[in-house]
Amino acid sequence: MNTAASMAPDLPNHFAPGSLVRARGREWIVLPGASEDELHLRPLSGSEEDATVLCPVLEFDPVAPATFPPPDGRLRASQETALLLRDALLMSLRRGAGPFRSFGNLAFEPRTYQLVPLLMALKLDVVRLLIADDVGIGKTIEAGMIARELLDRGELKRFAVLCPPHLVEQWVRELDDRFHIKAVAVTAGNAARLERGLPATDNIFTVFPFTVVSLDYIKSDSRRGDFVSRCPELVIVDEAHTCAGSVGNSGVGRHQRYDLLRLLSADANRHMLFLTATPHSGDETSFHNLLGLLKPEFPQLQTLTGNARDRLREKLANHFVQRQRVDIDEWHDSGIFPRRETANQPYALSGQWESFFESVLDYCSAVVERAGADERRQRLNFWGTLALMRCVASSPAAAVQALRTRMSAQMTGEEEEELRERVFDGTEDSLPQDDGELPAQTDDPGLANLVTQAERLLGQKGDPKLVALTKHLEELIRDGFAPVVFCRYIATAHYLHDQLKSKFSGVTTSVVTGELTPDERKQRVDELTEADRPLMIATDCLSEGINLQHGFNAVVHYDLSWNPTRHEQREGRVDRFGQEGVIRDGKRTVRAILMWGNNNPVDAVVLEVILKKAKKIREELGVPVPLPDDDHTLTNALMQAVLLRRHEIRARREEASRQGVLALDFPEVPQIKAMDIAWVDAAEKAKKNRTVFAQNKLRPAGVLPEWEKMQAALGQTDDVRRFAHRALSRLGAGLEERGRSYRVPLLPLPEMLRERLFAENLHGTLKISFTQPPAIGARFVHRSHPLVGILADGLLESSLNTPVVKVGAGETAVDEPPSATEASSSDPAVLGRTGCWATQAVQRPSAVLLLRLRHQLITQGADPLLVEEAAAIALVATDGGQRMELVTTGDPLDWLAAPTAEEVADKLRVEQVANALAELDNWQPLLKNFAEERANALLADHERVREASGVRATVRGRAAVRALLPVDVIGVFILLPALGF
């Protein structure tokens, strides 16, 4: 067996992680982080939540070594309770065996393909990864798994997530809900409060180990240096493409973010994860800047050729993973994503609405035509006309608000940049603050008539665009969909809500805009998700930040975005991992409807020139390629051309319609050709780079075995479902099946368990599901869900702490053999640890021992870790029953679960159990050998995931595993051959 002596800390053996000690009148397990002066302890029969810290020198009674008590033969178990005891032990493990340390702390069941970034990370001394998976595949999950694994391996103690402001709260929730990590949000709004009262030698990032930091807050020169000097060991950067720097006028903010990341990456020992769905937008400088954050030599790929380039490309493949949904097929996981049905649905303005829109276009065209010599004034006036057009096309309410909002003539350069980004839908950093109506009012007297027309329309019925939306929603709701209507402006969202809230019978309608705080938005979404037939009206504050797949399955784009990425973001809120969808033709389906005005020349050109082109590139390449227009020069020129030539364009369109031609064509507009050429060039570059940098090293055959080992070590979905059914039924709170979900009444549970559940905000009657995606409105119950953990810990604590206890149905606790019918049900939370029954699964008397194995895992440069494992061994009588021999074939748990045969006489049952308990000391050599074999297997698992495909063995991966003896014998169960077998 591998020895850990050379890497073990200087601790007394009985203080080492995994050791048993006695203190304060009870037994404890020593947890990692212990020293001679400070012990981190978990009750022997308790949970991680009961852990405490004590100082041995301050204890009245000395802390002493302890041993695990053997089962008490006076409390005997039925087969049913023996199996429940085994399941409770399995579900209680948080520091489980297998190749990964963190899986016992995951609040979900990851898919096999999501293990790839984790395995890539474990092969690197310093983790530097660019994770560029498609929208909805699970980049947040993949990054969180890496962070949790490094934490649980003891390889880091702190980390920070850097992300745009609108994603801060989502990251805080995801880390807590999925990974049991309590992170602190750090934004411009709360940083001063967090810093208040801190000692001068500390700051936020030294006091709070886990932080989620707004990039807008931390990028400034005044804060950047302090963060870099005290930065945690791991940094996760979300939406990394917005931080990569760029050629041209990409904005001061992007360059500040890039400078920050460049300083952070200069520390060669810092772990960094970069997440983006669009790593390459056709801007070679930006893309290679991003690669340079992984390793400084990677930008040389631009200039190297031949073998030198191939070798560097091979090296990059260890740091870069990019997959689309079609790549998931080979992982046998493609069925987890729904089919997306899309449709472009035109509507036509008519009557007063058409007249008003034409008046606005005439006004805007005149502004463009009479542009003066002052370039800045000309630019701002044009942006004002675009803002007005967009608001008018959205709704009368947005038009009124825009016309009443005055554009400042004294804008700073940064304010101008912000206005430009909002007009062209260019920014991805401030979506929640981006849904207010754009200012359009100037000193031009021509606006007065437009204000009057807009106000008159606001009170009119028959809005053609609203009528078209109502028709689409009726169809969606009739087909069983739960839609989200995305619009561009707050005023439009409220306008639609007012018009639709009483339109559909039995439908619950709500509105969510950037006026609400992140917590208020989340609460409103959660409340609407509980409705039987929900309809949500939202601005783009929900196109990022809150996942909607568990309550909604359709998207309507009421307003076109000029940025195709924004459409993908909207649809990606529902079309993602975990979406249940609506079953159509046997397939889970989501639906997306894009509305556009067919007599609106701006909508027409956005649809034909921008959105359809983006879709075509995505379909051909497999990944999205953003429009290569960071400074919006192309879009600006395009819109000017459309306004100046709108009558000609309309005439061409009407002629095409008369000839039955469906697609628009603008071959004579040079600006359209320029945009098309630039975009095709960007797509070709992205296609080339996707081929060059594809991740092909880790294949399913190399990952699936690790996944299967983790499922065996910690339990999978079927194990969780079985345990919950058995435990809740035994405790009087049986599950009530409701289709794909279950109702769980918590009131019948013992008071101790109810109190623990209440502390986790679980009370009353729960609606739960054991599968992903869960039924709408149901909670997904996984192995680390509080319901499972509290049930498992409660049953174990009651059973392991009770040498002589009250008994439940089918069990007896006696000094003398009782009658066969003697039974009691006074404490169903107590499970017997010994039992005896007859079964056809064995031909000779056999003993199945349920064990908890404790190992100490020591890795170079890290604190020792405690690893626990639930296991079972079988011993079979030989030599006429004179001795027991270890069985090395088959699964002992299959024997334990095999159907029972006839009743065993009470006297024989008592004798068999007593004899087995008396032999426990004699079986210790067998148990010791088994534990050491399992320790060697654990070491092999640990080292195997460190083995690199073409990467040298690393110092960081060296490890040793030591079995902690004696083994904990949780249960002893005797199986006798059935009569006549």
Roles of regions detected by a PLM:
Residues 1-5, 34, 361-364, 368-483, ...:
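Charged, non-catalytic accessory extensions
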Residues 24-58:
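Basic/aromatic-rich interaction segments and small domains that mediate binding to polyanionic partners
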Residues 51, 55-84, 90-119, 126-127, ...:
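SF2 helicase/translocase NTPase motor core
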Residues 142, 146, 286, 468:
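Hydrophobic positions on the alpha1 helix immediately C-terminal to the Walker A/P-loop
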Residues 200-201, 207, 211-232, 244-416, ...:
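Inter-lobe coupling linker of SF2 helicases/translocases
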Residues 540-583:
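Conserved RecA-like helicase motor core of SF1/SF2 enzymes
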Residues 574-608:
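Conserved segment of the helicase C-terminal RecA-like domain
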